[in-house]
């Protein structure tokens, strides 16, 4: 990456464009994400209905900034912006964020979603995108699936969908679906690199984790992952200790909230899509 000289005006980014397989080398040069290799990137770039990669170029034509997002239920989940050194301070991150919002609206998404750490810089961007806090403060845990277990294999799992788990008790879920507030036991899922990401914790207690993993395992196995990401209330210290004992990995040091911006009624000609996969466990 090239350093900018002091007192030199910021480099102006080119127009926002949708990225394709031809941008693979440029993306991997800028984006540093665990488990995002050329194979995972190729899979996402080949599924524009499920993953939205957008970027802007430097004046010489080289990729200068990238934003990654994905379909999660009927919302576009913003996963992160990566800006090369020459474009830092240019407003490229904000340019990409607003372009993603406009594209999502035009393509029939019901809104935007993003995990927001309240006291981090991204909270300001979330405010500019009018993302409103949804649900409790949570910690996101990356939980390994047990190596064994009588797991059925989901027949045609794709990149996202809906998982319905029969409630173990009549008690409410530990974290209700943060995207829709659907009936207990129903959550949205999306395939994010090496893990399956759930939009809630559909069981009543963290001690019911085994049932949740058993329900998610067929999907995870079908898409080639061995880990599941789950939100757990940040105030539930016993849940955090329980998950730590299972070698679950907490994805951020401080709690996060799901920020959500709903577009309102779907635009004419862009009907909301049904989830590609609905699996009942």
Model-based region annotation:
Residues 13-27, 154-172:
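A short beta-loop-alpha structural element at the N-terminal edge
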Residues 74-85, 192-207, 231, 256:
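Conserved acetyl-CoA binding element of GNAT-fold acetyltransferases
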Residues 14, 60-66, 76, 182-186, ...:
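Glycine-rich phosphate/pyrophosphate-binding loop shared by adenosine-nucleotide-utilizing enzymes
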Residues 104-117, 222-232:
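Conserved GNAT acetyl-CoA-binding A-motif
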Residues 83, 89-102, 206-218:
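Conserved acetyl-CoA-binding loop-helix of GNAT-fold acetyltransferases
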Residues 132, 138-166, 249-281:
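C-terminal "cap" of GNAT-fold acetyltransferases
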């Amino acid at each position: 990456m090239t350093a900018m000289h002091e007192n030199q005006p910021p480099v102006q980014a080119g127009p926002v464009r949708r990225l394709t397989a031809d941008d693979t080398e440029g993306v991997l040069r800028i984006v540093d994400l665990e488990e995002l290799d050329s194979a995972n990137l190729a899979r996402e770039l080949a599924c524009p209905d499920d993953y939205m990669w957008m970027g802007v170029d430097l004046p010489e034509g080289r990729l200068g900034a990238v934003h990654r997002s994905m379909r999660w239920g009927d919302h576009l989940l913003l996963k992160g912006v990566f800006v090369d050194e020459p474009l830092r301070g240019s407003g490229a991150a904000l340019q990409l964020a607003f372009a993603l919002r406009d594209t999502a609206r035009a393509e029939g998404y019901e809104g935007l979603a993003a995990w927001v750490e309240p006291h981090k810089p991204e909270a300001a961007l979330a405010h500019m995108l009018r993302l409103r806090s949804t649900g409790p403060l949570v910690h996101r845990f990356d939980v390994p699936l047990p190596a064994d277990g009588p797991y059925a294999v989901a027949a045609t799992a794709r990149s996202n969908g809906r998982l319905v788990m029969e409630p173990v008790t009549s008690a409410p879920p530990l974290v209700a679906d943060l995207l829709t507030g659907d009936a207990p036991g129903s959550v949205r899922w999306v395939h994010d690199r090496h893990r399956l990401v759930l939009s809630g914790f559909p069981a009543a207690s963290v001690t019911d984790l085994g049932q949740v993993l058993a329900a998610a395992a067929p999907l995870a196995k079908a898409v080639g992952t061995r880990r599941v990401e789950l939100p757990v209330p940040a105030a539930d210290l016993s849940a955090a200790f329980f998950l730590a004992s299972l070698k679950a990995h907490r994805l951020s040091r401080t709690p996060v909230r799901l920020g959500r911006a709903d577009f309102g009624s779907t635009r004419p000609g862009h009907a909301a899509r049904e989830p590609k996969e609905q699996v009942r466990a």
